[in-house]
Structures are given as structure tokens and as C-alpha cells.
């Protein structure tokens, strides 16, 4: 946990930098959700370890901001001297306009994307607040034992799985480079998103614990050459076709030397890199952002096969969990170890796709709760346990949530669970026309919960990368999901309901956006396969169509995964699965 003396040291750094306040984002130069330990500056300063957030340190106070997923976590983790607020109810800019008018705000220009900087700058100017780029990071200056940045080898991603060769992707990117210019075609493109870099080159990396990224910047030339800035040794084991590797220290000079027109994505390009480019800049979303979101037929097949592999691990885990709970108390931290153990039996398993979220009882109400050794609890009996986990496999990525009964929970929990299931089924069975946006599907999903007077404070669904980030843009199913949902996308379906201090419920499967030829509409094909806990379902609250969907889903598990379970020769496991997927009726 952060020490109050860190705040005092940061305030000394404010004076040395000549600014009145410091902005500390939870992010790195690549603006990713997961960052290496060397970039966990917000956690070092405040104690808060959530995957999204921002801190503001002034001489008078220190304020921590994150979204509704982390409200409870902020309160429990923040160090002495910090206050906290939940976005969007309280936005950092609004707080600054109330408390910090006519003052300066220092920031690290490598840690703020250009688009975010401009939005903040425009709003803060109305209150006379000046954003000041700093030539060093004040948190780094007071972090003597800061971990070293990762330097781990990259590896090739199977082109047979990708469905497109590196050269085919480079050609598509070059063709798209001219689409955003009505005059001169760009001569180069800055690649500032590691997901784009990995997708483009058909490579993956080990720089992060849960996301197979290579953390590096690159430049794609109009001639089809990709220059990557990083340690040579990291790229020694990957295909060198169309690839040049330069030391990271050369990035700034090479950007300054670019001629003609350069395409940059303002949502990921750091302010510091944009500043050094002297050539004319065209700003547009990197075309690969949508390209990689629309999975190729090969990638879709890989997702289906990988989810069958993951289903075996999940079924074995759920069986183990039930059996173990009957024999002895189970701690939350045991869950993560068990899931990794079962998934590791697959030869192509790489790592978890995120830190497992396992909350028993009231901890389940903390949307992104993470159990830590020595700080976790025994999972309570006669309650609920929310388990959100996933795996990175060499072919694809999984993300699945199951909420399970731990004994005989109160009827109110089963009632809430059934309403969440109804919301899940509403999205899973939806048909919608081309042009439908994520916000429209979000409302469709929430409608059954709203009818019951229920709501949840997170998005309904996010994109998922192919052995890339478990949270992938550009589309989402959420109240802010203004992007169109298009065929080929892999998205999550994860409505929930949470009662602070008592329990949390979430049911999550991944779905593939496909065409429904019978209605000329789009539809969602569920690809995650693991039993939904029928001990928590009140069939009387469900329609015939909802019961039919559940029974058909469980029948699929029996057909597709049942033979793989039976092949293990474990009669007890087989019997457990058969009971878990037995048809229900009123």
C-alpha cells in the first residue's frame, strides 16, 4: 500500500517542476488497460490497483478517480491523504474546474494520448487551467525501487490461424492509408497501439502478464516496410520479412526526420511523439483497429475450437469447486490457482487473459475485485460466488463469468440471478439490422432488469482480441457504445446485478456477430460453453422461450463438450456434468 510520505515527496516534485498540481494516469506510453509493473505509477502513489483510473495531486489535497467498477475498491485501497470519486458522476475536469481554477497542471506527455489531451485542454481552458508537459515523470523520481521495463522475446502467430499473411495485412493497411486524405496520400503511418503492431506483423509477445503484446512503437512506410523500435533480441525469433528493428532510443529522431504526410491515430499517439513529428500529420483512427475486430473465418474457427478447450477446463473447475466446498472451506485465492491448473492442461495455453475476479458473498459486489493472498476471505456458505476468468491460448482468447451457489442461498439471490439470466438471454437471442450500435443492444439487454427495478454499473459487452487484449475496441455494448456492431466481431454478453456488502451476480459468455440468413438480420452466436448454475434459477419467472434457450444451450454443451469430458474416464465428473445440464421446466 502507498505511503503518505509519497504524497509529501510528490508535492516537493511539484515545486521543483514549477506546477501547481500533477496528473497521474493509470497507464503507460501505449495507453493500454494492462501495464507492466514499471508503469504502475498510480498504484505506487495512491495504493489503488484497478485497471482504470487517474490521480490528481495538489499541495492541498489528492484526488483519485475511477469508474463504477472500482468504487468500492478505491475506498478500500486508497492510501491516507487521498479522497476518491466515481466517474462519470464526478469527472476529473469538472473537479479541477471547481477546485483548481487559474492554476497549472503538470503531466507526462508520453502518458497522455493526443485526443485525450485535447479534450482535457479544451475544457480546462474555460477555467484558466494550463496543462504543462513535463520533461520527466515526478513519480519515477521518487520511486527508487521501480521495476525494470520488460524485455521479453516475441514469437510468431500462426498465419494459418490469422487467415491473412503479414504481407496481405501490410498491403491492406497501405491501401487504407489513403482513405483519410482527400489530397496527398500519407507516406508513413505511426503505429502507437501494440495490438495493431502484433496483429499487423502476426506476432505476439510476453511483455505483459495477461496480454500477449510486444510493447513497442513502429512506423509503416508506404513502400511496405515496418520499422519497429525496440531491443533486437526481442524480435530475433520472429519472421524478419518486411521488418526492420531499430533501438528504441532512435524513435524520436526518426519521427522528426519523416517527410511528406504521416498518419497518426490520436487516440493512441502520445502527445510527446506527436510533438516531434515535423511532417504534415493526418489524424485518423488506425485502419487496423476495425480490421482486427472483424475476425477472419480462420480466426472465428480458432475461437470456437479454443472455447471448446476452455469449456473442458471450466467444467472440471466447476466440478472441483462444488466437490471441494462440500468437504472443506475454500479461500478466494484458491480459485485462481485452480483455474490456472485446469487450463494449463491444454498444450496451447499461454496465461490467464486477466487477473481472475473471484468474490464470495459481499466481495462479489466489487465488480473487478481481486483476491490477494493474506487479504482474501473464505467463500461463505449459503451465498453466491462470482468467478470471472479467462485464458490466453496460442489461437484465441477466452473470457467467461459464472456465478455459482455455495450451498442454499436465500430466495432473493435466486430471484436476482434469474433476472440477470433473462437479460443475458435477451441479448443472446436478439436479431438486429445492420447499422445497429452498441448502445442500442445495451438497452435491449438491460430491459428485463429495468422491468424488475434492477440495474448494473458497467458495460454489457466488450470486444475480444484473437490472442490479443481481452478488452478490444472499437465497439462495445454499453451506454457509451456508439460504434456500429458488424459481422465478424467477437463480443462479450455479461449483464449483472450487485448488492453492496451482500453479493454480486454476472453471467458472461462470448458471442460472435453473424448474419441470420432467415431474417436478413444480424444475430449473436454464443461460443462460450459452461453450465449455468440451475440451482439459482426460478423457472416460474422465465418465459417458455427463455427456458427453451437455456435447455438448448445446455444440450449443446452435452453434444460438443460431453464426449471430451467422458473421454477423461472420470465417472464422477461425467455424472456432475449430466446433472448440471439436465433440462429444466416449470
Please report, for each region that a protein language model flagged, where it lies by residue.
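Active-site neighborhoods and metal-handling regions in enzymes and metal-associated proteins
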Residues: 1-586
Amino acid at each position: 500500500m502507498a505511503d503518505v510520505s509519497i504524497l509529501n515527496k510528490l508535492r516537493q516534485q511539484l515545486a521543483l517542476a514549477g506546477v501547481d498540481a500533477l496528473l497521474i494516469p493509470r497507464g503507460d506510453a501505449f495507453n493500454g488497460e494492462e501495464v507492466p509493473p514499471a508503469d504502475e505509477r498510480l498504484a505506487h502513489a495512491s495504493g489503488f490497483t484497478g485497471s482504470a483510473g487517474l490521480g490528481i495531486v495538489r499541495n492541498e489535497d489528492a484526488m483519485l478517480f475511477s469508474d463504477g467498477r472500482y468504487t468500492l475498491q478505491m475506498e478500500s485501497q486508497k492510501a491516507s491523504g487521498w479522497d476518491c470519486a466515481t466517474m462519470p458522476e464526478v469527472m476529473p475536469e469538472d473537479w479541477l474546474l471547481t477546485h483548481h481554477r487559474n492554476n497549472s497542471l503538470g503531466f507526462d506527455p508520453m502518458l497522455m494520448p493526443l485526443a485525450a489531451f485535447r479534450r482535457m485542454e479544451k475544457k480546462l481552458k474555460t477555467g484558466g487551467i494550463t496543462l504543462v508537459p513535463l520533461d520527466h515523470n515526478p513519480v519515477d523520481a521518487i520511486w527508487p525501487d521501480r521495476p525494470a521495463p520488460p524485455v521479453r522475446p516475441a514469437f510468431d502467430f500462426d498465419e494459418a490461424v490469422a487467415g491473412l499473411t503479414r504481407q496481405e495485412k501490410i498491403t491492406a493497411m497501405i491501401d487504407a492509408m489513403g482513405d483519410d486524405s482527400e489530397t496527398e496520400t500519407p507516406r508513413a503511418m505511426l503505429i502507437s497501439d501494440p495490438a495493431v503492431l502484433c496483429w499487423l506483423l502476426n506476432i505476439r509477445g510476453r511483455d505483459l502478464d495477461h496480454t500477449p503484446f510486444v510493447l513497442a512503437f513502429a512506423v509503416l512506410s508506404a513502400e511496405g516496410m515496418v520499422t519497429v523500435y525496440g531491443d533486437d533480441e526481442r524480435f530475433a525469433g520472429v519472421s524478419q520479412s518486411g521488418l526492420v528493428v531499430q533501438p528504441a532510443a532512435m524513435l524520436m529522431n526518426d519521427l522528426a526526420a519523416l517527410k511528406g504526410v504521416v498518419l497518426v491515430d490520436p487516440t493512441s499517439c502520445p502527445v510527446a511523439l506527436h510533438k516531434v513529428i515535423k511532417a504534415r500529420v493526418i489524424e485518423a483512427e488506425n485502419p487496423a483497429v476495425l480490421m482486427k475486430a472483424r475476425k477472419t473465418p480462420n480466426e472465428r474457427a480458432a475461437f470456437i475450437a479454443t472455447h471448446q478447450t476452455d469449456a473442458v477446463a471450466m467444467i472440471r473447475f466447476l466440478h472441483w469447486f462444488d466437490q471441494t466446498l462440500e468437504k472443506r472451506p475454500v479461500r478466494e485465492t484458491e480459485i485462481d490457482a485452480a483455474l490456472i491448473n485446469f487450463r494449463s492442461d491444454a498444450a496451447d495455453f499461454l496465461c490467464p487473459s486477466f487477473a481472475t475476479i473471484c468474490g464470495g458473498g459481499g466481495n462479489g459486489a466489487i465488480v473487478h475485485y481481486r483476491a490477494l493472498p493474506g487479504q482474501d476471505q473464505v467463500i461463505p456458505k449459503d451465498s453466491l460466488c462470482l468467478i470471472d476468468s479467462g485464458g490466453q491460448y496460442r489461437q484465441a482468447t477466452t473470457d467467461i463469468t459464472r456465478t455459482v451457489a455455495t450451498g442454499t442461498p436465500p430466495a432473493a439471490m435466486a430471484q436476482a440471478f434469474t433476472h440477470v439470466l433473462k437479460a443475458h438471454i435477451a441479448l443472446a437471442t436478439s436479431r438486429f439490422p445492420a447499422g445497429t450500435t452498441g448502445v442500442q443492444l445495451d438497452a435491449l439487454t438491460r430491459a428485463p432488469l429495468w422491468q424488475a427495478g434492477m440495474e448494473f454499473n458497467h458495460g454489457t459487452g466488450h470486444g475480444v482480441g484473437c490472442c490479443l487484449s481481452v478488452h478490444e475496441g472499437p465497439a462495445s455494448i454499453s451506454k457509451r457504445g456508439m460504434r456500429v456492431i458488424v459481422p465478424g466481431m467477437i463480443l462479450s454478453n455479461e449483464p449483472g446485478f450487485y448488492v453492496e456488502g451482500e453479493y454480486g451476480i454476472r453471467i458472461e459468455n462470448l458471442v460472435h456477430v453473424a448474419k441470420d440468413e432467415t431474417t436478413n438480420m444480424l444475430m449473436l452466436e454464443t461460443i462460450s460453453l459452461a453450465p449455468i448454475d440451475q440451482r439459482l434459477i426460478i423457472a416460474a419467472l422465465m418465459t417458455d422461450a427463455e427456458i427453451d434457450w437455456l435447455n438448448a444451450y445446455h444440450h449443446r454443451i452435452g453434444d460438443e463438450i460431453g464426449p471430451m469430458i467422458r473421454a477423461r474416464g472420470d465417472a464422477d465428473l461425467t455424472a456432475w456434468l449430466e446433472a448440471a445440464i439436465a433440462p429444466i421446466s416449470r
